[in-house]
């Protein structure tokens, strides 16, 4: 009886694994290799216009899925992994905001020409808008006017929005019993 149950479970597992697409596997069932980074743009070499990249991933030996080759390797598309149209330097923007922000040069550099002129003729909004812009730019809440991201070093200080989906694991930690 025990062998029959074991055989049935193995048959059902192997039959169901073969119909699963490799892109639909759980993150703990495959390992993706590091991708090449372009030294000029500080982005992935495979960065596409929709901000996704292609990475090569290898499944565990016992995983069967549709889309992998005989070596167990498949290409996976990772969404929102790069910034394709980034052309405004984050470092330059911060330095312009600190040293020339009261003249509105930072806003003009980002593409906000009208606000830059207002800051220029009001000396940074009597230095209030200047301080606000330093904070907004350093926290990356104020970006380029065309909607692209900042061009910054690959391991630079990137701030990104946290998005939750069906693959996100999060826990709540409390201090019950800490004392």
From Swiss-Prot:
InterPro entries xrefs: TM2 (IPR007829), TM2D1-3-like (IPR050932)
Compartment(s) where it occurs, according to its Swiss-Prot or TrEMBL record: Membrane
Residues annotated as glycosylated: 75, 169
Bilayer disposition of the protein: Multi-pass membrane protein
Side Extracellular, residues: 19-82, 133-179
Signal peptide: 1-18
Major localization class: membrane
Gene Ontology CC annotation, any one: membrane
Spans within the Cytoplasmic topological domain: 106-109
Transmembrane annotation, as ranges: 83-105, 110-132
Disulfide bonds: none
Highest taxon of source: Eukaryota
Keyword Flavoprotein: no
PANTHER family registered for this protein in UniProt: BETA-AMYLOID BINDING PROTEIN-RELATED (PTHR21016), TM2 DOMAIN-CONTAINING PROTEIN 1 (PTHR21016:SF1)
Protein name: TM2 domain-containing protein Y66D12A.21
Organism: Caenorhabditis elegans
